[in-house]
């Protein structure tokens, strides 16, 4: 049994909690804090000296030691973290609200990787006293739940940071058609700047957060593209919208000051409002009146430059240069791609992390946040992007990925090469590595079999065997994945469905066109019922995955989506049977020519595309309408 000296009681308790993840052999480890290198481990013959600079780094050091002792007796390792703060932010606003048990599990793994900070992105998913519609039926965290999560992070000397919204991205709240909510609204999902009741709401946000020990918060304010152009415009006329942003920011910062918080905010709106074409990555000319405001506010807020797309260091460097025109207090947010359907893209996350890390180091950035967004339903599993998180940890502490697989296996029990096979539903053989967002996992699954509006973005002769092989690979990995087996079981079933579904709509049309009623009958009576059965199995597996990781709220959306898909397959069966029985002289849906869904990659030599909004994949009809 391992014997430690130099641990305080809290550290000893934390190590007990981590025993389920890592184990050390019968050795002696002398632990001490040092103001020099981040992590230093030296020794042999069962006796080791371990030092750490910041308390949270102890747990990575022990993981690194466990890895090293698995390879040999003599250990001599030094690591120097490039970033003072390395954070992971879990999105809890796109229906999937991480449950408390899973938040604790995530904190444990992050501690072993060397993260300093755990963040939760909560648009309306925390409770505010006196605001019953805020988080209504959305699984909003109580103050007690947030306190429990924070206390667990503190057990590992990690900081907990809430990420909220104080301007836009509040659609789940402002949709409610009651006066007390609508009077807070400017347009779309944006709050009405200047309305005093808005600042009462924001005060309530901070009142809830003040029950935590942390005094660091991200106040959001990103993607408020139409700010000042709805009710604000009617009430106040045309104004300089960059100045309007500054005025609102100052009011929010004043409220934050009242509760003792230091704020971060996403930086994009300043650039979008001051650039000539409304884009984030542009040079900007700052109007003088806005410059006066920014000079006054810049020391009160940290700007977070977020970028999940660039495949070269130079592109990040250019955007850092633009940010420094506004402020020197800049943090960086990269992405662990879990927002394009059921399947993540750790491979692309690795590519962009390597380049972003180079630029962050070159620009002396001291804080990096890895974001795990969950766009359009939070369907990707929370723990599916663990490889991306380990990649950023390795880049921070080592500036290379030489030990990535060994460290990852210590922390998860699975090699990173095996774990990253979870991406397979997105990794079609003909796709280049440097394109983001291409997501056949989602649009092949959700598209209709009678009205397959994305059919031309599939290459069945390539895709069908790819998905079938992926299902087999993932099933094999499931057997050795331990606590993470559920992830691979779900993905294996998804890939099996994709293999069945990728050509069925096309074959229905081809058989109908040539009058092949034998094939139509075989599809309607055998293939489509089998496909429904496969989807029902997937729904059960997905539901288990969801309930393991998240609160139940939000699962209703997936029930509706998959239930609709099943009913549409039944409709296809009945339409084909009616045609075969002579009850219909034609199937109208099969006579409509399929047009391009988009032209994003029209000049490329592959078929796949990006389609990430369920309501546009599932039907050409209107779901959102008046």
Residue ranges: model-predicted function:
Residues 2, 16-52:
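Short, well-ordered secondary-structure micro-motifs within conserved domains or adaptor modules
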Residues 5, 44-264, 331-334, 339, ...:
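Feature activates predominantly on carbohydrate-active enzymes
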Residues 35, 44-46, 84, 297-299, ...:
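Residue-level preference for short coil/turn positions at secondary-structure junctions
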């Amino acid at each position: 049994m391992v014997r430690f000296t130099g641990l305080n009681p809290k550290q000893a308790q934390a190590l007990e909690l981590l025993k389920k993840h890592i184990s050390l052999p019968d050795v002696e480890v002398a632990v001490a804090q040092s103001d020099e290198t981040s992590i230093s481990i030296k020794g042999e013959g069962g006796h080791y000296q371990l030092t750490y600079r910041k308390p949270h780094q102890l747990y990575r050091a022990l993981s690194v030691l466990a890895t090293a002792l698995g390879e040999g007796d003599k250990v001599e390792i030094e690591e120097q973290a490039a970033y003072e703060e390395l954070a992971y932010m879990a999105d809890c606003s796109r229906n999937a609200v991480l449950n408390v048990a899973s938040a604790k599990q995530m904190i444990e793994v992050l501690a072993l990787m060397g993260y300093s900070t755990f963040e939760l992105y909560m648009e309306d998913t925390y409770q505010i006293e006196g605001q019953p519609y805020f988080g209504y039926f959305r699984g909003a965290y109580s103050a007690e739940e947030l306190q429990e999560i924070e206390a667990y992070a503190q057990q590992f000397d990690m900081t907990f940071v809430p990420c909220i919204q104080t301007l836009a991205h509040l659609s789940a709240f402002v949709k409610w058609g009651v006066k007390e909510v609508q009077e807070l609204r400017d347009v779309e999902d944006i709050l009405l700047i200047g309305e005093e009741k808005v600042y009462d709401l924001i005060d309530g946000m901070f009142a809830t957060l003040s029950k935590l020990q942390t005094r660091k918060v991200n106040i959001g304010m990103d993607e408020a593209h139409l700010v000042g152009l709805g009710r604000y415009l009617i009430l106040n006329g045309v104004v300089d919208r960059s100045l309007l942003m500054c005025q609102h920011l100052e009011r929010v910062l004043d409220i934050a000051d009242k509760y003792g918080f230091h704020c971060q905010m996403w930086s994009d709106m300043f650039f979008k409002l001051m650039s000539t074409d409304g884009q984030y990555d542009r040079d900007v000319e700052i109007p003088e009146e806005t410059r006066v405001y920014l000079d006054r506010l810049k020391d009160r807020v940290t700007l977070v430059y977020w970028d999940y797309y660039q495949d070269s260091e130079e592109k990040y460097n250019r955007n850092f240069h633009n940010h420094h025109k506004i402020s020197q207090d800049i943090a960086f947010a990269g992405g662990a791609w879990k927002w394009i359907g059921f399947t993540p893209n750790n491979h692309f996350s690795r590519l962009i992390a390597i380049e972003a890390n180079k630029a962050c180091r070159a620009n002396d950035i001291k804080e990096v946040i890895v974001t795990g967004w969950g766009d359009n339903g939070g369907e990707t599993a929370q723990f599916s992007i663990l490889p991306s998180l380990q990649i950023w940890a390795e880049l921070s502490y080592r500036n290379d990925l030489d030990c990535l697989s060994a460290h990852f296996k210590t922390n998860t029990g699975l090699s990173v090469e095996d774990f990253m096979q979870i991406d397979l539903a997105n990794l079609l053989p003909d796709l280049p590595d440097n394109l983001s967002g291409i997501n056949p996992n989602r649009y092949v699954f959700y598209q209709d079999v009678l009205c397959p509006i994305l059919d031309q973005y599939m290459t069945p002769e390539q895709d069908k065997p790819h998905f079938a092989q992926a299902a087999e690979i993932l099933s094999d990995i499931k057997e050795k994945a331990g606590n993470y087996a559920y992830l691979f079981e779900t993905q294996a079933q998804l890939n099996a469905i994709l293999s069945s579904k990728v050509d069925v709509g096309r074959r229905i049309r081809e058989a109908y066109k040539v009058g092949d009623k034998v094939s139509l009958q075989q599809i309607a009576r055998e293939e489509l019922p089998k496909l429904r059965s496969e989807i029902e199995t997937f729904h059960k597996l997905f539901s288990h995955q969801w309930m393991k990781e998240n609160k139940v709220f939000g699962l209703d959306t997936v029930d509706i989506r998959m239930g609709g898909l099943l009913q549409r397959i039944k409709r296809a069966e009945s339409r084909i049977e009616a045609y075969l029985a002579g009850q219909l002289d034609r199937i109208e849906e099969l006579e409509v020519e399929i047009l391009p869904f988009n032209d994003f990659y029209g000049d490329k030599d592959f078929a796949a595309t990006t389609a990430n909004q369920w309501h546009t994949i599932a039907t050409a009809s209107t779901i959102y309408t008046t």
